[in-house]
Regions:
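A short, charged/proline- and glycine-enriched loop
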Residues: 2-11, 53, 194-202, 457
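Active-site and donor-binding regions of nucleotide-sugar-utilizing enzymes
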Residues: 9-34, 47-48, 52-57, 61-177
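Conserved catalytic-core segment of nucleotide-activated headgroup transferases in glycan assembly
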Residues: 23, 189-256
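Conserved active-site histidine-acidic residue motif and adjacent donor-binding/catalytic loop
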Residues: 84-87, 270-278
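A nucleotide-sugar donor-handling region in carbohydrate enzymes
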Residues: 152-217
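Nucleotide-activated donor-binding/catalytic signature segment of Leloir-type glycosyltransferases, i.e.
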Residues: 252-274
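A donor-sugar binding/catalytic signature common to diverse glycosyltransferases
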Residues: 273-316
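C-terminal amphipathic helix plus adjacent low-complexity
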Residues: 334-457
Length: 457
């Protein structure tokens, strides 16, 4: 926002998981505050998100992936207020409070439900916030589905030039307004440029749902163990996203912690948690299947490998890295291979500022267009009603189900009996809620794999 802004902006973020809260809160700061125009230090290591330019109110959508206290602490992003809400409770809050900017950091169906719910809640209201949404990382699946579910926001953020081109093509291809697509970058990139460490440290960034099968996940763990034994002079870290019983953006049926119990791990191999930026501070080689951590690593010019052992496949997401120069196998890594990323490919992903021959891709200015668009919309006065592409006319067999999952009718109004919490839950309700979540996670991580294996007999 312009430095001349006379008052502190009020910004709200609604998120449904730990990673989306991190993306949403940091995005809100970057598109609303001049404090983030020039940044060289890691944003992940700083909790300076709710700075003097904005008041940030966080809302965590109640569900299977609602972040735990530990996960929120690990992210390290500070807000002026943060509380858990149901979808209907959040919509009610949006009719009581006045915000300048609202960031919807949700899965696609959640964004669509909130857009329709907000359109209904704000009927006849002369003013409303600028509504922003986007993606938390690499977009490698369900491109059309996810994009059309996000259509209707004032800004649909694309994390790279490549994504912006793809997003506009999808919207224009179905006859939807593509003017909302705005190119930015991932908001959590940063940190000091890479310098070789002693001891040399290899980090495998695990993912909750990729790969999916026990066989493939066991294979990757076995290769990591073999690499550690082959290179006893190296420190080898298995970077885990969540602890057993916790959920993140994706469901993890087979945690690596559980698989690791069957191994006699070498002394130089450790399982670690914590902030990804802090782990990258001590990384010499980042290895992953397709994690967004690869982009964080590339931004800091850390040698980065995207594994090909299980194939280069859309189901794994590593097809996104074709042309990056980072594709390699464990056999190559065991032999000492270090990849050299393609500068043009990296620049198109919105990372590694100034790494291209032409000097394009400045990360410091990556959010300038979004800030300008937000400022322009805030000064236009009354904004038009939200108009998503999906309506009861364009998607009569799809939209009602998307909205019903969030207890909303096809017109965006709350369904009868929709859960709403007008006050903080009492001790009994908190115990019941924790038990219900525990039962769900037990079903996902214990019962579902057994049933799946029985079905394969």
């Amino acid at each position: 926002m312009p430095a001349s802004t006379a008052r502190r902006l009020r910004v709200a973020v609604l998120a449904d998981s730990d990673t989306r809260w991190k993306w949403g809160a940091l995005t809100a700061a970057r598109i609303s505050s001049t404090e983030f125009t020039e940044t060289t230090e890691s944003t992940e290591k700083s909790d300076k998100t709710a700075d003097s330019d904005i008041r940030l109110d966080g809302f965590l959508l109640r569900g299977r992936a609602t972040p735990t206290v530990r996960q929120l602490k690990e992210i390290g992003v500070r807000a002026d207020s943060l509380r858990e809400v149901t979808a209907v409770e959040f919509l009610r809050e949006m009719t009581k409070e006045t915000y300048d900017v609202l960031v919807l950091a949700l899965v696609g169906g959640g964004v669509q439900a909130m857009l329709h719910g907000l359109a209904h809640a704000w009927q006849g209201r002369p003013e409303r916030p600028v509504v922003v949404t986007g993606y938390v990382g690499v977009v490698y699946e369900k491109l059309a589905d996810g994009l059309l579910l996000r259509h209707g926001a004032d800004l649909v953020l694309a994390n790279s030039r490549q994504d912006a081109e793809r997003f506009r093509a999808v919207y224009e291809g179905v006859g939807a307004d593509a003017s909302s697509v705005t190119e930015v970058a991932l908001p959590f990139l940063g940190g000091a440029p890479y310098e070789k460490k002693d001891p040399y440290t290899v980090v495998f960034a695990a993912q909750p749902s990729v790969p999916e099968t026990r066989k493939d996940r066991s294979y990757l763990l076995d290769r990591l163990v073999r690499h550690a034994r082959r290179h006893p002079e190296r420190e080898v870290l298995l970077k885990l996203r969540s602890k057993p019983g916790e959920h993140t953006t994706h469901i993890e049926e087979l945690p690596y912690q559980k698989l690791a119990q069957r191994h006699d791990l070498p002394a130089n191999l450790r399982l670690v948690y914590g902030n990804m930026g802090e782990v990258l501070d001590r990384t010499d080689l980042l290895v992953t299947v397709s994690s967004t951590a690869a982009l964080e690593s590339l931004h800091r010019r850390i040698p980065t490998v995207v594994l090909t052992d299980l194939g280069v496949r859309e189901a794994l997401g590593n097809h996104h890295f074709v042309g990056s120069g980072c594709l390699a196998s464990w056999d190559q890594l065991d032999a000492g291979h270090e990849p050299t990323p393609d500068a043009e490919w990296v620049a198109r992903q919105g990372v590694a500022a100034g790494s291209t021959p032409s000097g394009e891709g400045s990360y410091a200015t990556a959010f300038g267009e979004a800030r300008e668009r937000v400022a322009e919309l805030l000064t236009t006065g009354e904004l038009p009603p939200l108009k998503p592409y999906y309506t009861p006319v364009t998607a009569p067999g799809y939209l009602p189900g998307v909205l019903a999952r969030h207890h909303l009718a096809p017109d965006g109004s709350p369904l009868p009996g929709a859960p709403v919490a007008d006050k903080a839950p009492g001790p009994v309700r908190q115990i019941v809620r924790r038990a219900a979540r525990g039962a769900y996670r037990h079903g996902v991580q214990r019962v579902a794999p057994v049933i799946r294996r029985m079905g394969e007999l």
